[in-house]
Amino acid sequence: MSKLYFYYSAMNAGKTTALLQSSYNYQERGMRTLLYTAAVVCQKNDIKYIRSRIGLTSSARIFNGKTNLFKQISIVNKEKKIHCILIDECHFLNRNQVIDLTKVVDILNIPVLCYGLRTDFQSKLFSGSLWLLAWADKLIELKTICYCGRQANRVLRIDNNGCVIRAGSQIMFGDNNQYVSVCRKHFHKKYN
């Protein structure tokens, strides 16, 4: 029986690497995978692939707020059987797209593995994360560590001087050095 999985963490936990490894495992067994990533991530570099920090890459389809994932996946699956759907940057999904993914699991019987952030730099849930936390069959937290050695489960946004940014757009792209994964204790110490 297929399930909807949500793999979440703070930044720099290896979510994309884990996604690409999962896809490879399916492909190694002769199974087809279909990968998606968020258009907002691709707009900066006009890319249509998923790339991990350690250099692994794979081509991917792009989703934006208007993408009907159930319809797209149904068409591709009808042409040739898909064995697994993998979504990178799933925190950018909207409510209807998470519903689409539940239909992929329940109607098409295809497992869906979603990888993304749980919260933003203000410790607020992203839309996709909110609905995946509500509707996923399995929730799996990927671990990374704070500079103190505790598990990091929050993200701070910092400026060029190393000062914490407390306000601004939820979505901002730039160097990964603008974000620091920290534990709850150090989030509150630095953020407040």
Curated annotation (Swiss-Prot):
Single Gene Ontology MF annotation: thymidine kinase activity
Entry's EC annotation: 2.7.1.21
Sites where the protein binds Zn(2+): C146, C148, C183, H186
Keyword field contains Transport: no
InterPro entries: P-loop_NTPase, Thymidine_kinase
Keywords, in A-Z order: ATP-binding, Cytoplasm, DNA synthesis, Kinase, Metal-binding, Nucleotide-binding, Transferase, Zinc
GO biological process terms on file: DNA biosynthetic process; thymidine metabolic process
Top-level class of the enzyme under EC nomenclature: transferase
Catalytic activity: thymidine + ATP = dTMP + ADP + H(+)
Binding site for ATP: S9, A10, M11, N12, A13, G14, K15, T16, D88, E89, C90, H91
Compartments where found: Cytoplasm
Active-site residues (renumbered): E89
GO cellular component terms attached to this protein's record: cytosol
Family in the record: Belongs to the thymidine kinase family.
Subunit structure: Homotetramer.
HAMAP family in alphabetical order: Thymidine_kinase
NCBIfam families named in the record: PRK04296.1-5
Protein name: Thymidine kinase
Taxonomic lineage from the root: Bacteria, Pseudomonadati, Pseudomonadota, Gammaproteobacteria, Enterobacterales
